[in-house]
Regions:
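Short juxtamembrane and helix-loop transition motifs at transmembrane-helix boundaries
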Residues: 1, 44-50, 75, 111-120, ...
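Interhelical loop and helix-boundary elements at the membrane-water interface
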Residues: 1-14, 48, 68-88, 135-155, ...
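Membrane-interfacial alpha-helical segments at the cytosolic side of multi-pass membrane proteins
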Residues: 18-26, 92-102, 159-166
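Structural signature of hydrophobic alpha-helical transmembrane segments
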Residues: 50-60, 115-129, 179-191
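Multi-pass membrane catalytic core of lipid/isoprenoid biosynthesis enzymes
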Residues: 45-46, 53, 71-134
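Topogenic membrane-insertion module of multi-pass membrane proteins
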Residues: 1-63, 240
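C-terminal membrane-associated helical module and adjoining short loops/tails
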Residues: 145-252
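Membrane-interface helix termini and inter-helical loops of multi-pass transporters
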Residues: 32-38, 106-113, 170-179, 204-206
């Protein structure tokens, strides 16, 4: 029974991924109209930020299931497959729907934007497709213990999950305007998807020693994340993600 604990945690990851999808797909979008500018927009209620919360919880559980599996010597092929299936949902599909909703809001701001083709929104689902490919490649690759090939899907999912929090809690007009620009989101889709499917070496966030050379990349990422969190709030998440990518390329 003890050896099933990691699998139960993995399924809990999947559960919160499903909760994130529910929060991101919630109905109740509001059509607004600015009488001063004549601009129309779709405003999605603030509760979409719960999708970000559920993805964050899924990420914590995703870390714990691997830790518990190693602790109890309960690693198994079943656990490996369950982990990948759960990650596709929690860090691929759920973030993809968040992007879909932001694209919908961005395009609705244009003249006749509410009548725009759904085709403009479909690129959002490149993210879960790229994540699934990355996980499939990881499952058959035996060389990704200390160094990953491409950004792991949880990191990609977390950075996308941070954008609703940035949008609703930054109180910065410039940031909000950027997040309501469809071309910004097309850029996010391209960059995040590419980073997942590429074979660039990325640091596996696992401690394998206590010497400075091993710890330095982790210290840099943690320092940037903490300082950024104090200065710019939730914007610290994409900044930490960018730091992770840069540090991985420098400390190969």
């Amino acid at each position: 029974m003890i050896k099933q604990i990691p699998n139960l945690l993995t399924l809990l990851n999947l559960f919160f991924g499903c909760m994130a999808i529910t929060a991101a797909m919630q109905h109740g979008a509001i059509l607004s109209y600015d009488v001063n500018t004549g601009q129309q927009a779709i405003v999605i209620p603030e509760k979409i930020v719960f999708a970000s919360l559920f993805i964050a919880i899924a990420a914590v559980i995703d870390f714990l299931d691997g830790f518990v599996a190693r602790l109890f010597g309960a690693s198994s092929e079943l656990g490996k497959q369950l982990d990948s299936l759960s990650d596709v949902v929690s860090f691929g599909v759920a973030p993809g729907i968040i992007v879909y909703q932001f694209l919908q809001m961005a395009i609705a701001r244009h003249d006749n934007g509410l009548d725009a083709s759904t085709l403009w929104l479909l690129p959002a689902f490149i993210i879960p497709c790229a994540g699934a490919y990355r996980l499939g490649r990881f499952n058959i690759d035996t060389e990704q213990s200390k160094i990953f090939k491409g950004v792991p899907i949880p990191a990609a999912g977390i950075v996308i999950a941070s954008f609703p929090l940035i949008y609703w809690y930054s109180n910065t007009t410039l940031l909000n305007n950027i997040l309501l620009n469809e071309w910004f989101w097309y850029g996010v889709i391209f960059v995040v998807s590419y980073l997942m499917v590429c074979t660039l070496p990325m640091k596996a966030l696992k401690f394998s020693g206590v010497n400075l050379k091993v710890l330095l990349p982790f210290i840099i990422i943690a320092a940037v994340a903490i300082v950024a969190a104090l200065l710019v709030g939730w914007l610290a998440v994409p900044l930490a993600f960018l730091t992770y990518v840069i540090v991985s390329l420098i400390f190969k």
